[in-house]
Amino acid sequence: MEDMWLAFAQRKSCHHREALMELGYINWTMHRTNFEVGDIVFLFMSDERKVAFKTKVVAKDCDRTDIAYWQVRPNMHFTYKLELVKEYTGNKLDEDELIQHGFKGGRSIQHPLKNNVELLSYIDSVFEED
């Protein structure tokens, strides 16, 4: 069974939006992350303060191939490949809305999380109705 995750995409480190739009995927570090192929990963965009993308883990132990979108030197260890499933452009996934469904923000999303079932179910339902 696939798990759902929420991950924090930091604009100052990488231009994830551009990579997803141009490549159709991004690479995500395997360090301290336990994704499995088939898992769903929602991306909270640091600059927009909202969840904007639904991605799916399609491979692991991949070389980093999105280096052109990085603003800092990324670690070059193996990565997961997260393929774009859908972009959300509405306002139901803004930070203020997410807080109403259990989002803690701040340091709680330094590493991907999957244990907030209420929040992840809400995010998934918004993508499904869009």
What is each of the regions a protein language model found here?
Residues V51-K60:
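Short beta-strand-centered aromatic/proline hotspots
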Residues K12-C14, E48-R49, C62:
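Short, solvent-exposed loop/turn segments at secondary-structure junctions
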Residues F44-D47, T55:
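Short Ser/Thr-interspersed hydrophobic loop/turn segments at strand-loop and sheet-helix junctions
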Residues H31-M45:
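Short coil-to-beta transition motif at edge beta-strands of beta-rich domains
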Residues F8-L23:
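Short, basic/aromatic beta-hairpin or loop at an interaction surface
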